[in-house]
Amino acid sequence: VTNEEWSEAELKKMFPYFCTLHSLAYKRLRLEAHEIMDELDYMELCDMTGRKFVNKMKKGNGIDISMPTAQSHYQDVINLAYAKYPNDDDRLQKVFREVKLPDYGARNTIMQMDKDLTNFKRDRHKLEYVDYFNSFLEMKNPPPLKYLFIDEAQDLSAHQWMVVDMIQYISKPI
């Protein structure tokens, strides 16, 4: 064991919750990899709907990292709607007023894609990154924390701030 490996292992032992908000939600919800949408799920959804869906998450070592899609403008609009207006059933309509859509049929296509994705996840009991936060907020089970450190807070979405607020309210860190 090298000093670097030992240090990382010791850090994980000493600070088990030193992680991203997504990883914290993943851990606290006790999620398993098979419950998360993966490449095969997105490929199946594409085949079923004839529309382009891409995996926005990169999995590794139990940590999920959000990646930009860039391959699916319509899916990016859906993701933006959930990030900006997580608890608003009118989220897509609000985002439609804020972003320039590429063509006249885009609204209908995006609304159908959102419905298809929602139904697919429901039918297969799968989650995406945005679902971690929704479930974590519903469950309200943050770990007991002495300190709460938010790195790059300026980049957090409204949804992520809701998670931070819930953690602060329940855990009451210094």
Feature names for model-found ranges:
Residues 15, 169-173:
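A short helix->loop->beta-strand "cap" motif at the edges of active sites that frequently abuts
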Residues 8, 164-165:
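Short amphipathic alpha-helical segments and helix-helix/interface helices
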Residues 1, 149-151:
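Short, hydrophobic beta-strand segments that form beta-sheet elements in well-ordered domains
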Residues 155:
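Short, flexible loop motifs at catalytic/binding sites
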Residues 2-79:
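Conserved P-loop NTPase-based nucleic-acid remodeling module centered on helicase motor cores
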Residues 59-149, 158-163, 173:
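Accessory N-terminal region flanking or inserted into the helicase ATPase core
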Residues 34-35, 165-169:
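Glycine-rich, phosphate-binding/catalytic loops in enzymes
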